[in-house]
Structure formats: C-alpha cells, structure tokens
Amino acid sequence: MCVSRLALLLGLLLCVGAQLSFAQHWSHGWYPGGKRELDSFGTSEISEEIKLCEAGECSYLRPQRRSILRNILLDALARELQKRK
C-alpha cells in the first residue's frame, strides 16, 4: 500500500512539475523546430561581395579550418542548406 501511494505521489509530482516548468523557450519570430517566418525577413539587400562568394569567386581568402571533423560537419550543413533552397 505504501509503495503504491509513493508511486502515485511521484507521478502526480512529475505531472505538476512538468506543467510548471518552462522547459522550452521560443524566441520572437521563431517556431518549434528552429523554423522562422519567411515574411519577417522582408527584402534584404545582399552586397555584391556576398553574391560573389556564393558563386565561388570570393574576393578574400577564407581562413583554413583547423579541424577535419568540423570541416566535414560544416560542408554537410552547407549541402543541406543548399538542398532546402
């Protein structure tokens, strides 16, 4: 009997604690999953230098990445972003 009351009390405490906690915070303009409302960006001006870098013709040298793992992760992220466009 004591074990069942303890289990019930712990379950109730868990439910109340989950409702009262602020486990997830969404910043203004962001939605769950990291999505952002596209209309909030408006028409942004992109400089010519950025356009050239996207085409692969950067006017400046990029610093070399030190870590191979970081390089692989950044390249994979860049490919995923290109797929979504």
Curated annotation (Swiss-Prot):
Pfam families xref list: GnRH
Source organism of this protein record: Haplochromis burtoni
Modified residues (Glycine amide): 33
Chief location of this protein within or outside the cell: secreted
Tissue expr: Expressed in only one cell group in the mesencephalon.
Keywords assigned by UniProt, alphabetized: Amidation, Cleavage on pair of basic residues, Hormone, Pyrrolidone carboxylic acid, Secreted, Signal
Residue positions, PTM Pyrrolidone carboxylic acid: 24
CC terms in the record's Gene Ontology section: extracellular space
Localisation: Secreted
InterPro entries: GnRH, Gonadoliberin
Protein name: Progonadoliberin-2
